[in-house]
C-alpha cells in the first residue's frame, strides 16, 4: 500500500446535504421543509420549551429548594488512591494536591473507605469515614482527625 492509495473507511466521509438544488437532487422544491407555515419560513420555528401557547411544563411545575451558599465543599477520595505513596509517608491535603490525587482542596478532603490500603501511612488534616479509619489503622498507619 502506498500513500496515494489510502482511502477513508467506507461511510466515514458523508457528503453534506445540498438542499434546494433542483428536483433531481432529491432535496429540491421545498428543501425538506414541507409546505407553507411557520417552520417553512426563513428563521422559522419555535423556541425550545414552547408548547403552542399551552402553559409549558417548566412553568407548570413548582420551584423547589435553593442552593446553600454556605455549604462546605469537601473533596472526597477513596483509600485505594493512597497506595501511590511510600510506606511511612505523612499524607496531608497539600501533599495530595501536589501529587495530583485531588485537583483542588476547597473546604477540606475526606478519605472514604472504599478499596484496600497496602501501605502504612500517617494521614493528617483530613476528615475520615469510620471504615477508612479502621482500614488505615489495620494497615499499620496512623490517623490524625482534624
From Swiss-Prot:
PROSITE patterns: RIBOSOMAL_L15
A Pfam entry, by short name: Ribosomal_L27A
Keywords (A to Z) from UniProt: Ribonucleoprotein, Ribosomal protein, RNA-binding, rRNA-binding
An example Gene Ontology biological process: translation
GO molecular function: rRNA binding; structural constituent of ribosome
GO cellular component, one term: cytosolic large ribosomal subunit
Keyword Translocase set for record: no
Gly residues compositional bias, start-end: 21-31, 42-52
Region listing for Disordered, in residue ranges: 1-54
Entry-linked InterPro entries: Ribosomal_uL15, Ribosomal_uL15/eL18, Ribosomal_uL15/eL18_sf, Ribosomal_uL15_bac-type, Ribosomal_uL15_CS
HAMAP family in the record: Ribosomal_uL15
Subunit structure, as described in the record: Part of the 50S ribosomal subunit.
NCBIfam families, per database record: rplO_bact
The family this protein is said to belong to: Belongs to the universal ribosomal protein uL15 family.
Described function: Binds to the 23S rRNA.
UniProt protein name: Large ribosomal subunit protein uL15
Species this protein is from: Clostridium beijerinckii (strain ATCC 51743 / NCIMB 8052) (Clostridium acetobutylicum)
Organism taxonomic ancestry: Bacteria, Bacillati, Bacillota, Clostridia, Eubacteriales
Gene name of this polypeptide: rplO
Amino acid at each position: 500500500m502506498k500513500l496515494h492509495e489510502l482511502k477513508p473507511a467506507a461511510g466515514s466521509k458523508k457528503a453534506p446535504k445540498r438542499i434546494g438544488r433542483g428536483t433531481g437532487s432529491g432535496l429540491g422544491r421545498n428543501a425538506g421543509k414541507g409546505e407553507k407555515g411557520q417552520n417553512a419560513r426563513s428563521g422559522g420555528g419555535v423556541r425550545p420549551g414552547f408548547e403552542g401557547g399551552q402553559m409549558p411544563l417548566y412553568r407548570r411545575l413548582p420551584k423547589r429548594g435553593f442552593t446553600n451558599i454556605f455549604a462546605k465543599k469537601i473533596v472526597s477520595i477513596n483509600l485505594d488512591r493512597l497506595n501511590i505513596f511510600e510506606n511511612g509517608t505523612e499524607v496531608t491535603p497539600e501533599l495530595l494536591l501536589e501529587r495530583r490525587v485531588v485537583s483542588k482542596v476547597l473546604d477540606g478532603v475526606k478519605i472514604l473507605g472504599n478499596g484496600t490500603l497496602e501501605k502504612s501511612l500517617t494521614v493528617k488534616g483530613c476528615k475520615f469515614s469510620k471504615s477508612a479509619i479502621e482500614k488505615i489503622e489495620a494497615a499499620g498507619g496512623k490517623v490524625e482527625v482534624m
